[in-house]
Regions:
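Short S/T/G/P-rich N-terminal loop/turn motif that feeds into the first structured element of a domain
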Residues: 1-54, 59-70, 93-97
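C-terminal structural segments of small proteins and small subunits
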Residues: 65-90
Length: 97
């Protein structure tokens, strides 16, 4: 069942670090079957914390998304942005159609 990796960025203090993270992370995420659905774009928040950037990836399965996030390669990529980025991140299984 398709699964979604949702990242809500609350603060980004270094666009350079975020770019380096993206350069490393995107090929890793794609290697697990991830396909970008949302990467930035217009955002209007109606409740909750202010979100400055939203990223959503679609994965073939829940296990693929979890395996990607828990992989050594992905964790290594995240080190580029973790100290200059505050985000909330969720992995959510979609509906079966």
């Amino acid at each position: 069942m398709k699964t979604y990796w949702i990242s809500l960025y609350l603060e980004i203090s270094s666009q350079d670090n975020l770019k380096k993270y993206g350069e490393k992370a995107v090929p890793i995420i794609k290697s697990y079957g991830g396909k970008p659905v949302v990467r930035g774009g217009k955002l209007k928040s109606f409740s909750g914390p202010n979100v400055v950037r939203t990223v959503i990836w679609e994965f073939p399965t829940y296990d693929d998304a979890i395996s990607c996030h828990e992989s050594t390669d992905y964790k290594s990529a995240w080190t580029y942005a973790e100290d200059t980025t505050k985000r909330m991140m969720f992995i959510v299984e979609g509906l079966e159609h």
